[in-house]
Amino acid sequence: MGGGSWGYKSSSEYPGATPVHFSAWSKEKISVCVPQTVDNGTSNITLPAVYQSSTHANSCGIYKATTSTSDEYFLFENRSSGGYDQGLNMLLLDNSSIYTVGSNYSGGAAIWHVKDILSTCYADNSCMNESPPLVDLEEANNADLDNGSSQGRTTHLFYSANSATFNNSSTPDSKLYDNSSSGISVTSISAAGDNMTLTISK
């Protein structure tokens, strides 16, 4: 899983009270949340901060964009600083530096690329060896999760001051793992905050 600190296990408690939220995929997989499916066409979406999930009890504020490949899709969530996600302050590196972001962390939209073949690889214990990862955070900038250079950076999230577009020709791109177009385009991603807006076309 290319996820780093975005869903870190309980050893990440800081300072003993804020283990960070599970990733959107983890919440979906254990049936804690049922993501809201993005309609075909163009949708203007508001992503609430995941720490406010109690007000969005069923979906937890997570959105899901399916593709033409039945087991491949994208999940969207807002990892704003607050609640248990305050623990990210001491886990994430600030931009491209080697220092944690601390109180300057404001969050952003996390975009997850999922290849849901867990039942297949689990049977022969090969899930950890899958390439590309079955669950991968699309790193907006300073991509270094997959090579182990960091556990997460503020610039891995999407927000207007960092990266506001995710489509077939962006870096990273929204292509499927076979390099064909997913048909997913995300534009007009807002500034980081407890309620982020973006436009998804599919």
Predicted regions and their residues:
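Non-catalytic C-terminal accessory/binding modules of secreted extracellular proteins
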Residues: 35-202
